[in-house]
Regions:
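Extracytoplasmic thiol/disulfide redox context detector
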Residues: 2-133, 184-201, 206, 228, ...
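Cysteine-centric redox/oxidoreductase cores and disulfide-bonded domains
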Residues: 129-237
């Protein structure tokens, strides 16, 4: 009986000590001078540098969620043949890009790798020519090729040929079997205008911009980040 009572008393003492410690810690935090609390936050962020970027990403996703919801169909419906991957996709990844953008070019192998590895993925390519006249010509010709079902030939050839210029654009146009000079086409101009409007609503400040599910990712985020975002969409069902 005494042993049980002693054990109970010891348990109560330990529990009381833990509760007391927690209360003391809480009081210290709430009573802590501002400069100390700021220092602790700073130390925590230095120890975990991803916290800030993850927080910014989460806030941005919340900010643009209504825009994505109201423009989902427009974003994920390709112009002509400006897409690759699954005909009936499980997940759609949208990329806004410029053929003259080095970060877009650097991202291209990651995008191609995702397509090879994921049979349920579709990539929708949206032209956003922001880097000069040659970018605009390349974008118009890509859309012209897209209308004829030859987007892939133009797209892949131009990436391999190099930065958009009259010579490289001509090589890509020849591969797609289209004239090297863009023709006036209201549908193409409307597509470019729509892309700029959508990108503006999503706060795009450059290229590339990737959209998958409710995520908006700016810049050359890399293979792992894109793969994780795609997996997150699947996990949500």
């Amino acid at each position: 009986m005494n042993e049980k009572r002693g054990s109970s008393l010891m348990t109560a003492a330990i529990a009381g000590g833990l509760i007391g410690s927690l209360l003391t810690a809480a009081l210290l935090i709430f009573a802590m001078p501002e400069y100390l609390s700021s220092r602790i936050v700073r130390q925590g962020m230095l120890a975990n540098p991803n916290i800030l970027s993850e927080t910014v990403d989460a806030l941005r996703d919340q900010q643009y969620a209504p825009v994505l919801a109201s423009n989902r169909r427009a974003l994920e419906t390709p112009f002509g043949s400006s897409w690759k991957g699954a005909e009936k996709p499980e997940v759609t990844l949208v990329e806004f890009y410029d053929y003259a953008c080095p970060y877009c070019k650097a991202s291209n192998p990651s995008v191609d790798r995702l397509l090879r590895e994921d049979p349920g993925l579709r990539i929708v390519y949206r032209e956003l020519p922001i880097l000069g006249p040659d970018s605009v010509v390349a974008a118009r010709l890509a859309l012209q090729a897209s209308k004829q079902g030859r987007f892939g030939q133009f797209h892949d050839t131009l990436w391999k040929a190099g930065r958009p210029a009259p010579q490289t654009i001509a090589v890509a146009a020849q591969a797609a079997g289209i004239p090297a000079q863009p023709v006036k086409d209201p549908a193409i101009e409307a597509e470019l205008k729509s892309n700029f409007q959508l990108a503006g609503q999503l706060g795009a400040t450059g290229t590339p911009v990737f959209i998958v599910g409710d995520r908006v990712m700016n810049g050359a985020v890399g293979y792992e980040a894109l793969k994780k975002a795609i997996a997150d969409v699947r996990a949500k069902g």
